[in-house]
Each structure stands twice: as C-alpha cells, then as structure tokens.
C-alpha cells in the first residue's frame, strides 16, 4: 500500500513538473518574423522595424498570471553573429533591444552601413521561451 502511494505521488509530481516546465513552451507551429524591412532592403535611419507573431501572443514584460504562459515580448537582436545564451536572461545593451511594453514595431537609430536584424521572444523575466522563438536573420543596408 505504501509503495503504491509513493509511486502514485512520484508520478503526480513528475507530471506537475513536466507541466510547469512546458508552461512557457510555445506550440510547435508558433513563429516570430520581421514584417519590414525586408531582407536586403536599403533604408534610411531611423529604421522602422515591424514584427509579427503566429501561434503565440504578445504581452508586456513582467506580465503575471495565466497570460504569461501563452505570450512573450519581442527583443530585436542587432548585428549579432551568435545568439545569446538561451538559458539566461536576454542581455540589455545596444545589440539587444527590449520591447518591454509589448510593442510590435520600433524605430531604430542605426549608423550607415550593413546591419543584421533578428527577433527573439522573451518571457516575463526576459528569458527565451523553450523552445526559443527566433526569427530568420535579415540583412539591411542603411544609407
């Protein structure tokens, strides 16, 4: 009897742990993408970047409650050759622009030259979703 109870409790705790681990997991069809500018666009600064998302939601950083499990907020990665560590909060610097208010567009002041842009969705604590929602990297030229 005790062995069955321990086994049952272990299974329940494992199921709850798996459910919590998946709480911030977007569905497999979810994606983030840059609407504009287009890849290889020639633009002037400030650059208007419009972002889209399918299969998941957008919410401001720090959102609490159930909504935080079904949404995140955008981060624009600028001129990065490598993605940030997916197990740590997304850095906050000139190459990692946080859209804390849940914005889906932003004006970026970029110097003339070639630049790369990519999106990474973060949760309420600025950590990437698991699995991470990352857009394709685009390249633009600022005149």
Write out the residue ranges for each language-model feature:
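Bacterial N-terminal signal peptides that target proteins for export
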Residues: 1-9
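C-terminal segment of classical bacterial N-terminal signal peptides
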Residues: 14-22
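Serine/threonine-biased, Pro/acidic-interspersed low-complexity stretches characteristic
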Residues: 21-31, 130, 134-137
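Long, low-complexity serine/threonine/glycine- and acidic-rich segments characteristic of extracellular
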Residues: 40, 46-54, 58, 64-143
């Amino acid at each position: 009897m005790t062995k069955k109870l321990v086994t049952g409790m272990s299974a329940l705790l494992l199921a709850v742990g798996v459910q919590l681990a998946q709480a911030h997991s977007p569905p497999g069809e979810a994606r983030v993408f840059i609407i504009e500018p287009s890849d290889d666009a020639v633009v002037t600064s400030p650059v208007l970047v419009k972002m889209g998302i399918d299969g998941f939601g957008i919410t401001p950083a720090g959102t609490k409650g159930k909504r935080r499990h079904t949404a995140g907020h955008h981060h624009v990665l600028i001129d990065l050759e490598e993605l940030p560590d997916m197990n740590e909060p997304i850095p906050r610097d000139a190459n990692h622009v946080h859209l804390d208010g849940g914005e889906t567009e932003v004006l970026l002041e970029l110097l003339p030259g070639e630049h790369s842009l990519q999106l990474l969705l973060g949760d309420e604590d600025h950590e990437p979703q698991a699995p991470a929602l990352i857009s394709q990297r685009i390249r633009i030229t600022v005149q």
